[in-house]
Amino acid sequence: MIWPFKTSTRKKIARIEVTGAIASGTRKAVLKALKTVEEKKYPALLVRIDSPGGTVVDSQEIYTKLKQLSEKIKVVASFGNISASGGVYIAMGCPHIMANSGTITGSIGVILRGNNLERLLEKVGVSFKVIKSGPYKDILSFDRELLPEEQSILQALIDDSYGQFVSTVAAGRNLAVEKVKEFADGRIFTGQQALELGLVDRLGTEEDARQWAATLAGLDPDKVELDTIEDPKPLVRRLTGGDSQLQTMADNLGLTESLKWCEFELSTSGQPLWLYR
């Protein structure tokens, strides 16, 4: 028999996870989950963040949606082991932030990395012929040194992205821009230090964050249920075909996280990153 009545979500708290490096796959999964939260009219959302950050635009889009959603329902962010760089950025879309005292956070800044293999290519006798429409079309090419004027162009790009980051943190935490710049130099700090700097509101566990979200929504913290909105299958599950034994083996060997990181590195090469390395 099919039960004819739908379970109400108005007395439940939605929960989503943002884990690992933030890239396009993360953005798609999180935005899909946030759409579900909005459509099902949950009164509150708990966002569990355990991420070193990632790509700029993907972080910005998650932040924007969280900020929009926070105008309709109560949204609480809970920092796990690490919530750094882009992980901090997306949390700025949440009016209420809780971290563990030992959480690694901060790393507010931008990094852009390129590799120069010119000498190696010379040793193996490999060279490239490049035809380009402008002098900077092959900027950050791996077969030659970066020119001083190219470095200036990239530094301007980094500085602009950094300014966006600082402004968002200042607005999200109600701090002066100059105050944020005092600690937004790429350094990392603990959750305890983040509390002292005004980057988070409280210290506590994810369970504490759940109870906080319930209270904000006017629900009984001891009775309210938590609905975790699942994300699509990650790469390793697609490769194992969903086989639980293969999945467990991959997890035990550390292949799951390694594949995630390889996928991220391949998809973000040459991009500015809000990432703690």
Swiss-Prot record:
Keyword Hydrolase: yes
Top EC class for this record: hydrolase
One Pfam family, short name: Peptidase_S49
GO molecular function, one term: serine-type peptidase activity
InterPro entries (alphabetical): ClpP/crotonase-like_dom_sf, Pept_S49_SppA, Peptidase_S49, S49_SppA_C
The keyword Transferase is assigned to this record: no
EC assignment: 3.4.21.-
Keyword terms of this UniProt record: Hydrolase, Protease, Serine protease
GO biological process entries: proteolysis
Catalytic residue positions: 85 (nucleophile), 137 (proton donor/acceptor)
Record family assignment: Belongs to the peptidase S49 family.
Name of the molecule in the record: Putative protease slr0021
Source organism: Synechocystis sp. (strain ATCC 27184 / PCC 6803 / Kazusa)
